[in-house]
Amino acid sequence: MVKLTSFIFFLLFWCAGCNSQIPETESVEEIAMDNTNFDTLTKTIHVFVALADNQYQGIVPVPAKIGNGQDPNNNLYWGCGYGIRTFFKKSSEWKLLKTRKLDSIRLERLIFKHQTKNYYLVADAYDGKYIEKCTGDFLSAASGQLNDTIHITNTTIGIKGNSKLVSYIGHDGLMDFELSKLYENADGKKRDCIILACISKDYFAPQVKAAKANPLVWTTGLMCPEAYTLHDALSGYVNNESDEQIRTRAALAYSKYQKCTVKAARNLLVTGW
């Protein structure tokens, strides 16, 4: 059943332009710090990406090259033309500061700085085999159970639960497995979240409610979680637009790239409860 209800559109809408080269970046210092002291005037968006994986995820298989969850360079959600790395690198709104490998699970981290606003964007690509850990880390951040900081360009920024917004991108693994715990809010803070995965409102609702997070954009049906939806939603977010305006931006982007009606995109991408 799961295979019939996820990634069905990818057989029609997969991107051909994958980027097999790790992008060159400036030499920018990034140092792990303690998880409490950071510049609270500088805002962060942390994106957790579970790479598409034909072998380890319950998906309708996509072409092998873009469905290898151990190869971020060619993955549908990362190195392909509409993947996070390629799409945001080409954006005029964001500047890529650093690319690095973290460990055997988080295969690559990108750090972007917004060109005009005091926002950083941190995106982590998880080996598709570890989609359950990616999901858990996202929810740990959304609930304030997992907090961290990094030092970049003479600024210490908050990441994970210290972020203003956290996002999950990828297959909805909750269609395949059950998490071992409920990620309850740990600190009384409400974080915004964007969950771009199939039917995420239904599957993530209990966890998001327990985390006391604000579901800024999530989904009611099958969808293709490529980068343009997140990108355009964030264009509104960094300009302090309302939740509804941000949702509309996301829907317009999805309509444009998926060539569906705006009404269909708005029915798919919703905000709040």
Question: Which residue ranges define each predicted feature?
Answer:
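Sec-dependent signal peptide recognition
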Residues: V2-F9
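C-terminal motif of bacterial Sec signal peptides marking the signal peptidase cleavage site
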Residues: C15-G17
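Catalytic cores of nucleophile-dependent amide-cleaving enzymes
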Residues: G158-G236
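Sec/Tat-exported extracytoplasmic proteins
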Residues: F88-S92, A142, L146, G170-G173, ...
